[in-house]
Each structure stands twice: as C-alpha cells, then as structure tokens.
Amino acid sequence: MKVGAVNWRRARAQHRLFRRALRAAGAHLLELPFVHGAYDCVFAKDNAVLLEKRGQRRALLASPVFRQRQQEQQARARVLDRLGFDIFSPPPVAFEGGDLAILPGGRGALLGYGQRSSQRAAVMLEIFLDAPVTPLELKDPHLYHLDTALHVLSDGTALVCPDAFTPAALRTLERTEGIRQVLSVPREEAIGFGLNLVEVGSTVFVGARTAWVQALLRAQGRCPVELPLDQFHLAGGSAACLVSQLHPAGPAASDARPLPSSRMRPEPSPDSGQGPSGYLQ
C-alpha cells in the first residue's frame, strides 16, 4: 500500500460524495466528530463494534495496536455514549474493528488475527456478540486487516484474497457455517482496496478500479458503484474503513450486561468539526 501526503480538499470532497452516495442507496448515517490530532480517526470502523438488540445500542470498544489510534478511543466513547450506546470496555488484548466480519443474520463472525488483532480477542467478542467467532490467520503484512482481504456479502458469499491467509485459515473459512461459497480475488486487486467494500441492499460501493471484483459482484446480482477514494488509500484505507455498521443482534443474542461505563468515560471535553460517517441499516 502506498502511504503519502493527502490533499485534504480532495479528501473532503471524496468524503462528501461518499456520504451522499450512501444516503442515496438507503443508508442512514450518523456523523462522528473529528478527533483533533488523531488523523486516522476518519477510519471509523476500527474504533468499535456496534450492535443493536431490541432497540438497545451497544458498543464494544477496540484495543488498537498503535498509539496514534489509541488516543481516539476516549473521545469515541464519549460520542457513542451521547448517541445512546451502552459502552463495553475493550478486550485486554489487541483488537481493531477492521478485523471483524459479521456473518449474515448475526449468527457468527470472522476474526482476522496475526497483524493488528490477537486471536485471543475472539473470547470477548463471542461474549459481546453471543455468537461464535471464527479466527482466521492473516499472513500478508500488506493486507493487515480482515476487511482488506475478505468481504462477506449478505447472502453468505465470501470474496477472498487467498494470498492473505494461511492454508489452515482458508480451510477453516470454507467450513464455516454461514459461508455459502468462497470466490477468489487476485492479490493485486486486494492490495488496491478492491475488497474494502460497503454493501447497502443490492448496491456495493467500491473505492477503487477493480475489474475482477466488480465482475464477481455483478455475477452475484449486485450493482457495484465505483467511487473515488484514492486520497484515503494514501492513508491506508477505503470505503469499508470509513464506516462502522450498526449490526443487528443474532437470534441467540442474550441480554449481556455492559461493563461499568465509568471505566471508559473520562471528564467530558468538547469535540468539534465533521468527520467520518457511520451507517445504520
């Protein structure tokens, strides 16, 4: 992945276009404020896993590896609290939201580990989701989050870059309940953020020119919409990184108690400015 200086005017224009496209496709958006000094906070997916059960919103905060992302978490906890989320303290091991893929119907999830998240995070994720979590080992340092190496469509079709996973992880994926079929995507398209997708109904937003991925999507009855997000590629993310979906709880989800909110609620401080979008479906 190429990392370089971002043209902030172009980035803001691309972000506004992305927000408009999501709304036009039927997504409901919540705006999260920019965290001053934490420039990667635009990648809202990494901060927390969001879940809704019987009208109650819950947020499991992430445990980012790098200090640059760690400094976002208290500000994000305050905002999510104001939005009505019960705040769950983060796992005691490394975990970032970009390494979790919720399976259709909320019946389980996939956890990418080995780069930014720990396999041991699966234990707390299973408690939070009240659903099985299947760990998959990532081996390519250039595909460091699960959402750069894999996307699971709403029908259970998994678009996968095989080069990103260990052989054992690929075998596990193919046997995972909820995965209907596995379709391979070449590494060059995954490296270009071709699997960092956002699905809203039959529309799938793609932040890069990826002929292979878009052909697969059309073959599955989806309508790929390509949007310019190259300025975010320079910072290491694309469409899926920019949003955090509020997932419906699976049929087995129970009424778990949130950890004491005071553990993650420091003294309030003002947040200002407009930043990334989260979307609810």
Specify the residue positions occupied by each region the protein language model found.
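Cationic, low-complexity basic patches in intrinsically disordered or flexible, solvent-exposed regions
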Residues: 268
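The feature marks the mature, well-folded catalytic cores of soluble enzymes
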Residues: 1-265, 278-281
